[in-house]
Amino acid sequence: MAKITKEIVFGNHNLILETGEVARQADGAVMASMNGTQVLVTVVWKKDGGESNDFFPLTVNYQEKFYAIGKIPGGFNKREGRPSDNETLISRLIDRPIRPLFPDNFFNEVQIIATVLSLNPEVSPDIIAMIGASAALSISGVPFNGPIGAARVGYKDGVYLLNPSRKEQEESKLDLVIAGTKDAILMVESEAQELSEDIMRGAMLYGHEMMKNVIKSIEELAREVGKSKPEWKAPEIDTVLKARINDVARNEVEAAYLIKDKQQRYQRLDELREQTISALLAENDELNADVIANMFGELERSIVRNRILDGEPRIDGRDHRTVRPISIRTKFLERTHGSCLFTRGETQAIVVATLGNERDAQILDGISGESRDRFMLHYNFPPYSVGETGQVGSPKRREIGHGRLAKRALMAVLPDANEFPYVLRIVSEITESNGSSSMATVCGTSLALMDAGVPLKAPVAGVAMGLIKEGDRYAVLTDILGDEDHLGDMDFKVAGTEKGITALQMDIKISGITNEIMEQALEQALEGRTHILGVMNNALAEHRTELSQHAPRITTMKVAEDKIRTIIGKGGATIKGLIESTGVSIDIDDSGVIQLFSPDKMALEEAQKQIKALIAEIEVGQTYQGKVSKIVDFGAFINLLPGKDGLLHISQICADRTQKVEEVLQEGQEIEVFVAGIDKQGRVKLEWKDKPQAEAKEVEDAPVSATFLTMEEQSEEINSGNKISEEEE
């Protein structure tokens, strides 16, 4: 096949789609490029074997190569390893809008691999990878009801930005990724700085409109490639069997869905499913048990959906707009820095906040460069939370994705590092789950942080919305259950403060979501969020004014840049000595900002005291409690501040010429001295306050000299009484 290229203007740059040159043995391969960022996306699908599956085995692998930015990977092996969290999140971003577009009962294996080959740091590869995946699917011959387009939308000064650069993103109040077909929005993922529902809805509509040119270009590319798609026909439904299942099980299934307790309801449905399979196999042993089970599931779906559309109570008895009962316990765990047990219906999370110092920040080394993450949020979904057994170990894609959503919801309200210098780690342990566990994590995180004393700008709550739609009839549901998510047409999560939205995630399984439906969903989400915030405020209205007694303390100091060397010392000796003597962790940056970190408040104060003494200047006219550091023939050197001595002349010590200094003072002795003066060379002249002996007679030709430096650093000239030269450390 000859090389085919399509090029369109998309935001600030041209988007180029090429096929026919690279990876020609794949069913579909597209090189998607934009201003130096190039992503190769391939699609391969098995033409048979689907009949043995009872699910759709679609896998999406997004991978970033370090050579794309001219870097060699770190680590011992010097090659790319397991996917990073960012790669996992972008894999999910590609997967979510395309999965609903494959035909029902299409169970053939499909694999999509997106590889970043070249990266311009100003052009994010995620949108390019999503568009490339859509194009590769469209030319692969796989049954796919696409193509889709994708776009990133920013918002600054009242204007929406299409595919903003990384620099523009830093100044934007919105980071929204949207994907969909030319007729419908399918997926939205966003982080915002407390924006209104109208602004968010406008961003979605703007992004959907802007991506239509991309979809048109992909359609043209597919036509030119000209690969025919096999006619895919879903297996014919056995209407006789369907009717028989309806006769045998409908009444019992309807009664089962009146059971409000999830585990009891599931147990009853499992019993009914087995009874139905046994009864029908007894009537006809040629029937397939899996087919009967699938049709039983369709019966469940029909019953639940029609009840809701008919205005009947939901599975747990609520109406469409009511949030489940909420209970909150802060300070749930005794020895943690901050904790919360958040329960909403049958969904529950233990959320724990831990405070650390700058050394605890996570170092992220990706192809975009190294960065430090000062706010980590880890979401864990153990199998016991849904009453099942399963593997426990590394987080799965879903856990990484849910944790990322909850993190984005809190980013807008975190205090500035200068205001609250702690590194924060949140862990959300989902202990029960029946829908919306990620939004329970958002609420629990907000409360746990406030319980830990973190001064959030505002509390954040989240709620998951659902949709049931059949023809022109629809119902928008607030705070959906797991079954309503599974059997419904939309999962729409919204998090925010009283002021506005901070995060939004939407996945739609059907086309035809109108602007009216979206507006109603946002309005109901605001109503639900406001209610939840009210309950949260009753439990903990403001952050704790004091940190937990088990939390470490951090103090930040600022010193002049020319004092940094003094604090560090030769070869780091001074700062190491401070750390060893006080037990305090000390970090100092090039601007002179010092961060002190210790679980011991007294140790922290001692370290501060010693640092202040290190950088303090000796002042004329001040009295100091000094220590005799060295005795010489013409007097004694008195240490006033760390590394800074002054000379107490023999005339201030001895009563007459015959008396020796050693007869009056000993090394290590503490005395109170007065700074009489400092000459141009920085030498300090001292007087002994309240000295015990009478005034000494003047000693002719005795040198009067002093220095800021300790005697250990003086040259042999000191002992001979010669002029002391000033040296720098």
Swiss-Prot record:
<keyword id="KW-0963">Cytoplasm</keyword>
<feature type="binding site">
    <location>
        <position position="491"/>
    </location>
    <ligand>
        <name>Mg(2+)</name>
    </ligand>
</feature>
<dbReference type="Pfam" id="PF03725">
    <property type="entry name" value="RNase_PH_C"/>
</dbReference>
<feature type="domain" description="S1 motif">
    <location>
        <begin position="621"/>
        <end position="689"/>
    </location>
</feature>
<comment type="function">
    <text>Involved in mRNA degradation. Catalyzes the phosphorolysis of single-stranded polyribonucleotides processively in the 3'- to 5'-direction.</text>
</comment>
<dbReference type="InterPro" id="IPR036612">
    <property type="entry name" value="KH_dom_type_1_sf"/>
</dbReference>
<dbReference type="InterPro" id="IPR004087">
    <property type="entry name" value="KH_dom"/>
</dbReference>
<dbReference type="InterPro" id="IPR003029">
    <property type="entry name" value="S1_domain"/>
</dbReference>
<dbReference type="Pfam" id="PF01138">
    <property type="entry name" value="RNase_PH"/>
</dbReference>
<feature type="domain" description="KH">
    <location>
        <begin position="552"/>
        <end position="611"/>
    </location>
</feature>
<keyword id="KW-0808">Transferase</keyword>
<dbReference type="Pfam" id="PF00575">
    <property type="entry name" value="S1"/>
</dbReference>
<dbReference type="InterPro" id="IPR012162">
    <property type="entry name" value="PNPase"/>
</dbReference>
<keyword id="KW-0548">Nucleotidyltransferase</keyword>
<dbReference type="InterPro" id="IPR012340">
    <property type="entry name" value="NA-bd_OB-fold"/>
</dbReference>
<comment type="subunit">
    <text>Component of the RNA degradosome, which is a multiprotein complex involved in RNA processing and mRNA degradation.</text>
</comment>
<dbReference type="GO" id="GO:0000287">
    <property type="term" value="F:magnesium ion binding"/>
</dbReference>
<dbReference type="GO" id="GO:0006396">
    <property type="term" value="P:RNA processing"/>
</dbReference>
<keyword id="KW-0694">RNA-binding</keyword>
<dbReference type="InterPro" id="IPR020568">
    <property type="entry name" value="Ribosomal_Su5_D2-typ_SF"/>
</dbReference>
<dbReference type="InterPro" id="IPR036345">
    <property type="entry name" value="ExoRNase_PH_dom2_sf"/>
</dbReference>
<keyword id="KW-0479">Metal-binding</keyword>
<dbReference type="GO" id="GO:0000175">
    <property type="term" value="F:3'-5'-RNA exonuclease activity"/>
</dbReference>
<dbReference type="InterPro" id="IPR001247">
    <property type="entry name" value="ExoRNase_PH_dom1"/>
</dbReference>
<protein>
    <recommendedName>
        <fullName>Polyribonucleotide nucleotidyltransferase</fullName>
        <ecNumber>2.7.7.8</ecNumber>
    </recommendedName>
</protein>
<feature type="binding site">
    <location>
        <position position="485"/>
    </location>
    <ligand>
        <name>Mg(2+)</name>
    </ligand>
</feature>
<dbReference type="Pfam" id="PF03726">
    <property type="entry name" value="PNPase"/>
</dbReference>
<dbReference type="GO" id="GO:0005829">
    <property type="term" value="C:cytosol"/>
</dbReference>
<keyword id="KW-0460">Magnesium</keyword>
<comment type="similarity">
    <text>Belongs to the polyribonucleotide nucleotidyltransferase family.</text>
</comment>
<dbReference type="InterPro" id="IPR027408">
    <property type="entry name" value="PNPase/RNase_PH_dom_sf"/>
</dbReference>
<dbReference type="GO" id="GO:0006402">
    <property type="term" value="P:mRNA catabolic process"/>
</dbReference>
<dbReference type="GO" id="GO:0003723">
    <property type="term" value="F:RNA binding"/>
</dbReference>
<dbReference type="InterPro" id="IPR015848">
    <property type="entry name" value="PNPase_PH_RNA-bd_bac/org-type"/>
</dbReference>
<dbReference type="InterPro" id="IPR015847">
    <property type="entry name" value="ExoRNase_PH_dom2"/>
</dbReference>
<dbReference type="GO" id="GO:0004654">
    <property type="term" value="F:polyribonucleotide nucleotidyltransferase activity"/>
</dbReference>
<dbReference type="Pfam" id="PF00013">
    <property type="entry name" value="KH_1"/>
</dbReference>
<dbReference type="InterPro" id="IPR004088">
    <property type="entry name" value="KH_dom_type_1"/>
</dbReference>
